[in-house]
Curated annotation (Swiss-Prot):
Organism superkingdom: Bacteria
GO molecular function: DNA binding; sigma factor activity
Name this polypeptide is given: Positive control factor
DNA-binding region extent: 132-157
CDD domains: Sigma70_r4
GO biological process terms held by the UniProt record: DNA-templated transcription initiation
Taxonomic source organism: Bacillus subtilis (strain 168)
Ligase recorded as keyword: no
SUPFAM superfamilies associated with the record: Sigma3 and sigma4 domains of RNA polymerase sigma factors (SSF88659)
């Protein structure tokens, strides 16, 4: 792959050398054939630049948000509800290490408020004790996105708890 990239870059350099005298010359001095050559060489340079950028970056040039990067925001690492359930049961411990059924129901209700994305990040941070940075690396997002999402999830659950407390009072 590197050999191919090297060859393309070398060809691009040679093509630019060929194009330079045609680009510097006044168009009124150039013959019809030289004008055609100038246009063809300019197109060749554009194509070579496109290919070298594609080979270097591994994705189509010019796309601001490539599909492989867009997919990061739709992907979930934890998809099995049983795994999420096992995390939720381990969230709060009573002194003897057992979580009461009432607490489990409260945890389930709190987690039900969250989107899959929020739930995933929240559980990785609070249950698995992953750092924001590690979660960001795992999910392919920025650290600030993880922080904001976890903060939003905590606020949602806190509001629900406050509403439940008000309704009980």
């Amino acid at each position: 792959m590197q050999d191919l990239l090297f060859e393309y870059k070398r060809t691009l350099k040679q093509t630019r050398i060929q194009y330079k005298p045609l680009a510097e010359a006044d168009e009124s001095v150039l013959s019809a054939e030289e004008l055609k050559d100038k246009k063809i060489i300019r197109n060749m340079i554009t194509d070579l630049e496109y290919v070298t950028e594609w080979l270097e970056k591994g994705r189509q040039p010019g796309i601001r948000r490539a599909i492989d990067r867009r997919d990061v925001y739709q992907r979930l690492m934890i998809k099995d509800p049983r795994i999420i359930e096992s995390f939720s049961s381990a969230m709060m411990f009573e002194p003897d290490g057992q979580v009461s059924e009432e607490d489990r129901d409260r945890i389930r209700e709190a987690l039900a408020l969250l989107t899959d994305r929020e739930k995933e990040m929240f559980l990785l941070h609070k249950v698995e004790c992953f750092s924001y940075e590690r979660i960001a690396d795992l999910l392919g997002v920025k650290k600030s996105t993880v922080q904001t999402t976890i903060k939003r999830a905590s606020l949602k659950m806190q509001r629900q708890q406050e509403e439940m407390n008000r309704s009980l009072a």
